[in-house]
Amino acid sequence: MSGRRVLALYGALLLGFAAVVCRLYWLCSNTEYAVRAAAQSEAVLRLPAARGNFYDCDGLPLTGLSQSWLALCFPGEDSYARLYPYADADGQARLYRERNTSRPFLLDVVQDVSGLGVRCYAVPRRYAAAPLAEQLIGYLDSEGHGAAGLEAALDDVLYTGERDTLHCAVTAQGRLQRGSEPILEKADSAPQGVRLTLSRSIQRAAEGMAAESMATGCILIIDVSSGKVRACVSLPGFDAANVGESLTAPGSPLLNRAFSAYAAGSVFKPVLAAAALEAGEGDFIRECPGYDALNGQVYRCAGSVPHGLVGLDGALEKSCNGYFIELGRKLGPERVRKMAAALGFGKGQDIADGLRSASGVLPEAETLENEGQFANFCFGQGELLATPLQVAGMMNTIAAGGVYHTPLFVECTVDETTGEELTPLAHSSSRRVFAEQTAEKLQKLLAGVVAEGTGQQAAPSEGTAAGKTGTAQTGQFRDGEELKNYWFAGFYPAEKPRWTIVVMQDAQTEPEVSSAAIFARLCDALSAGA
C-alpha cells in the first residue's frame, strides 16, 4: 500500500473518531436532550382535579365530608392480586385489563390499603353516602365539572383544573426504579369554596323528617328576619355519585321540587286576605251554604259543608272557598293580581347565576276578566301555578311584618384553608308589600287557623304556630282517584316569628302523614335546637 493511501486511511479514521468525540460532547452538554431522556423514564400520574367545597352558614362542610383512596399499581407487582378484593366491579375489570401493562396506574379502592404494602393516597370524596341538599347542590359530570344545580351554576368558582401529580421514576417495563419513591407534587393553586345559607343541622333534621314521613314533596325553612334559607329538601333523593340510575327512576328524583311549579290550592288564600285588609275590606261577612254558584258553575267548599255566617277569620280557619270567591269579586281581579305579583307569584328567582327557579303561572289580567277563571283563582286553582319557594316568600312576608325578603341560598366564596370570606355572592333585596298593621292582623288570623281551624295538626308541642293548609286538585288520576298536592305553609312561633316553614307533598291520593303534622314536627325540632 502506498504511503499516500495509508495517510488517507489514517485521516479518515481520525475524522471519524473526532466526530464521535464531538457527538458525545454534545450529548453530555445538551441539557434539553438530557431532560427529554429523563422524561422517558418518568411516569406522571394525575390525581382527580381539586374542587372547592360547599359550606353551611356556620362554615361546616356540606361536601367533601369523607375520603376515598387511590392505590398506586406497578407492573410485575403481586399487588394486583392483593388489591382485587378491595376494588369495585369496574376496578376489578381494570385490574384484569391492566395485568400485562407496561405503565403504572392509579386504582380506586374502598379503603386505605397501605397495610398491604401498597402505596395509597387519600383524595376527598365529593358526596357522602347520605348527601345533604342534593337537588340544590347538584352533581358533577365525568370530567369533574358541575352538571346541575349549584355545582353547575358556580363551576367557574369551584373548579380550577389544577391537579396534584405523582412523579414516578420507572424502568423500561414501567416498574418503579430501585431506590426511588414516588413524589407527590401539589397543585400550584387551591380552589375557592362557597358558603351557603343552609344550616347543616337544620337541613339534616328536615331531611330525616322528610324521609320518615313523605314519599314525594319538599320542605323549605327560612329565617324570617333575613330571608336566608336554612333548609331545602326535595324528595325522592338521588345518589349524586351515581346519577345514571336516577335518570329513569320513578318520582323524578333529579327534580328540585322547591323550585318547580304546582297547583297551590287554599295556601294561596292569604294573598286575598292581605289584599282585603289593605283595601279596608277586612270586615266582609258572608253566609256560606257550602258552595258558590256562578253562571251555572258550582264551586264547592271541602265536603260541601255549609260554614254559616263567616268573616275573614272564620273563612281562613275553615278554608271557605265560597267566601274567598265573593271576597275576590268585591276586591276585583286587578287588586288581587297586583297583590299576588307583589308577593313574588309569576316570577322566577335567581338562586345563583345560571340557576333559576320556575316562574309558575300568574294568570294574565285578561284571563281573570273571565268570571269562572277568576273564581278558581280566588281559592288557588285554575291556571295559577306556584313554586314552594314563592309560597315561602309570601308567608315570610306576613311573618316579617309586611316586608318581602328575597329568599337567599348563597352567601359568599371562602378560602378553603382559612374559611375567610372572599367575595360576596348574595344579592339580597327587601321591599315593603303591605302595612305592618296588615301583617299583624294576618299573623293573628293565621294563628287562628292552627288553634281553631283546618291547621290544628300543625300545632307544635310547645308554643304556638300560624299558617294555612292547602289541598290542590291536579287533574291527574291514579287508579281512578285524583292526585292532589297537600300543602302547609306557616311560621313559628306565632307571636314572634323566627322561622317560615313550607311543607308540600305532591301527586298524592292521601299522604300517610299530613303536611300540617310534618310542620309541627319541624317546629319541635327547631325549638329543640336543630
Where are these regions (language model features)?
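Periplasmic/cell-envelope proteins involved in peptidoglycan metabolism and beta-lactam response
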Residues: 1-243, 337-342, 460, 477, ...
